[in-house]
Structure formats: C-alpha cells, structure tokens
Amino acid sequence: MKETLSASKIKVLKSCSWQYWCKYILKLPDKTNSGALKGNIVHLIFECLGEERHLKHYKSIIKHKDALLCKPIARLIRKHVISKNLTETEDLEDICAMINKGLMYDFFGNQYGEPTQVISEKDFEIEVNDEDFKYKVKGFIDKLFLYKGISLILIRDFKTNKKMYEGKEISDNLQDYIYTLAIKKLYPEFKDVKMEFLFLKQDIPNEGVMTMENKNEHDLEGFQHELTEVQKYADKFDEKMSLSNLASNQGMPKDGSFSGKLLCGFATKPNEKKKDGNPKWYCTYKFPFDYYCVIDKNKKVKKSAFEKKDLKYLKLEEGDKIVKKKYEGCPAWNVKKDSDPFDLDSF
C-alpha cells in the first residue's frame, strides 16, 4: 500500500480533490492559523499535566481555577505564546480558558471508576492486508483511559475549534470510526470502546462534551470495507483525478457541516478584508502564491514553506537543495484567460 491514511487525510480526499492534490501530493505549504497554534499549546499543557510528577501543578490550577497562577505552567504557556507570535492578551486568555475547562472535566478519567491505565498522546499505525480488507491507517489519540475491571476503554479527544460538529460530522465522524477501530485491534481483550470529544470553547460539562454512539462489529466491518476502497483510490490518485471532486462544484452544505463550497471561502482576492477590518478566511490553495521547497536529487519535494528562512533549520542531505517555486492557484478560481492577439505589451 502506497499511502498511509488518516482521519484528516481521508476528510480532505472526500472534501476536495484539488486540496488533496496540493497538500499531500505536491506537498505545498499550508497556512497555520492562530486557532491551530493555540490548540497546540493547550494540548502540550494537557500532556505535561497528565504526568504523575506534575500532579502538584494540576492541583494548584484546580485550586485557584487559573493556569496562570501556577508559575511553572504560566512560564511554559507564555514561552510558547511568544514563540508562536500570539498575543499576550486575547490569545493568552483564550488558551488559559480552554486549559481550565479541560482540567476541570474529569481530567484523570474517574467517571467510570479509577482507570487501570491512563495514556496521553497515544499514536498508532494499523495495517490490514487480508482477503477481505486492505488498508493502512494512522492516528494520534489525546487521551486513553483503560478500565480493566469493567472491560472498557474511553477515548477522549480535545477540540479547540469554535464550532461543534453537526450533521455528517457527527453521524459519520472519521476520527470516531478510525480511533474506535484501531483501539479494538490494539486491545482486543477489552469488550467496550467509548469515544468522546471535548469542545473546549463550549460549555463543559454540558453541551461541550460530545459522546459518540458506540460502534458495533457490523459498523466497524462496514467501515473497513470503506477504508479498503479509499485506500485503492488514494494509492492511484494522480493529476487527472485532482479535478474530479472540487469543493467549488459541491454547492453549499445543507446539514450545517463545514463542507462543500464553504471550504473555498468567500474571499475574491488574497488578503481581502471584511468590513470590520479582519481578514476573510479562504482555502490556502485558492489563490496563487510563491513558496520555497527542499527537493532531493530526484527532484522530489521533501519539505516546503512560504518563507525561505523556515527551511534553514533543516539539515540538507547530499543532492538536496532549496528552490523557489510558484503555485498558480486553484483551477476553479484562477481560470487562465486566452491571450489577446492585439495586446502589444505581451511582445
């Protein structure tokens, strides 16, 4: 199997063929917004406080209900806020609010009794190659609680995005299916697997906690058939297929999910502003841009970035070099006009 699947990779493949082509085949750079950067810091703090040696810091935050009143954690948060060029006012406040919510909601998984084992940042890669199913999938689980006495595993995933899931994002959630399937295969001795999402910008422990419907063997068997088909499609994906499922041709979503034409964004030009002065969001690959990439001796892209300085830290191997390239933009939004035979300026 050529490609290794993941929830995010499959979602992009299903959502927009051109975005998949740009991100995973051409390996173009992607914009990292402030929301994602803040989410990285929140996850880092949760991982740190999940360790037994940092229990006193966890207790300090719970006591004062403020992560910034625990000096070691406050220093760590501020260090990453500064390094990621986030603001020490609104962004810092937002990060601490999400941290407080995550810590105060059953952080050590005692809702089903004391766990036999707690695992933070569990990564996995599952490969199945038999008569019925052929797929390779990987993932990264924020928190895993194992309850041996009641034969239960609880998967918890922290979400730092503003909007909760709706429509197919709930009924056909790829992360839910993939994580549940993986844990069933990694821990076959456990009977039940539960999955929950914690939306840290919402009201927790109320609507901000989204518990997914349990998946039975029939559900997971059907999903493995789907994974097998996706694997075939991803392994043969080429430039011709990049135009086969453009988000711009899918219309607006009717189930409230962030999909279809919404994925393109409403900006008509790069860096366009709203009436209030804030930038309009749009897909990274909607408009043309220049970028830099590291290519090997066979001209294969190893890494790319918008700024050349962001590649300077890489250790280049023999035959590697950094080159500047130009991306022409999404074909749905950047149609090349035929040249004007009477345009003398083009000569």
Which sequence ranges carry the predicted segments?
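RecB-family 4Fe-4S metal-dependent nuclease core
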Residues: 1-347
